[in-house]
Amino acid sequence: MSMKILPAIDIKDGQAVRLFKGDFSQKTVVNPDVLEQARVFKEAGVTMIHVVDLEGALEGRAANRDLIAQIKAETGLAIQVGGGIRSLEQIEDYLAVGIDRVIIGSMAVKNPEFVEAALERFGSGKIVIGIDAKEGLVATEGWLETSNQDYISLALAMEKIGVRLFVYTDVDRDGTLTGPNIQHYQKLLASLKHAQVIASGGIQSADDLEEMKKLGLAGAIVGKAYYSGRISLEQIKEAERG
């Protein structure tokens, strides 16, 4: 099975940034021009990107919606978007401007009925559940809060109501370039019967991508490793082909 590799664009203050372990005070601007960054990916032959509205995650609204819609309109890239999704109207609006998949994060923990309603209205192909965990416990509200629910139990509960795709982020590894938490992915994949998993957090090299392919993951999100020059766009395409 081939693994899709999604370069990430995290948006804050209209710029493409990277955070360290999700800490907003430790942000690095990687490209002040978000559209230009998306074009770089497009020109390199990337087909899908992972876009996070960081203000949205903090404020619970689609703060960068217009910019994200513009990325879609100008590049035609497939886009999966997350950050601040709190209503069916927001999801509908994103899908209406051509966004391919919408990630529901905090609401999956706080309001499973919302996920059910989203699945019913938009279908499991458009809805992704983002599970962000700190030491195995699910983090919410832009990672500022940690719940007492572990990542496996949330994934199983979501799979039961019809979720078929997860993005799993190990917050402790995100933006650290220390390697992915392979054990967590193994446990998650072994627990799920129908759903697929996209990995995020800690990926530091093309070797990591090869190792993750062996696990049977549906995809992997590459952020800091690309922006810091450790993984090239050529290596990303090669890993997808291989």
Curated annotation (Swiss-Prot):
Keywords: Amino-acid biosynthesis, Cytoplasm, Histidine biosynthesis, Isomerase. It comes from the Bacteria. The keyword Zinc does not apply. The active site is at 10 (proton acceptor), 132 (proton donor). It holds the Pfam family His_biosynth. The keyword Cytoplasm applies. Its main location: cytoplasm. It is an enzyme of class 5 (isomerase). One of its GO terms (molecular function) is 1-(5-phosphoribosyl)-5-[(5-phosphoribosylamino)methylideneamino]imidazole-4-carboxamide isomerase activity. InterPro entries: Aldolase_TIM, His_biosynth, HisA_bact_arch, Isoase_HisA-like, Isoase_HisA-like_bact, RibuloseP-bd_barrel. PANTHER family: 1-(5-PHOSPHORIBOSYL)-5-[(5-PHOSPHORIBOSYLAMINO)METHYLIDENEAMINO] IMIDAZOLE-4-CARBOXAMIDE ISOMERASE. Belongs to the HisA/HisF family. This is 1-(5-phosphoribosyl)-5-[(5-phosphoribosylamino)methylideneamino] imidazole-4-carboxamide isomerase. It comes from Streptococcus sanguinis (strain SK36).
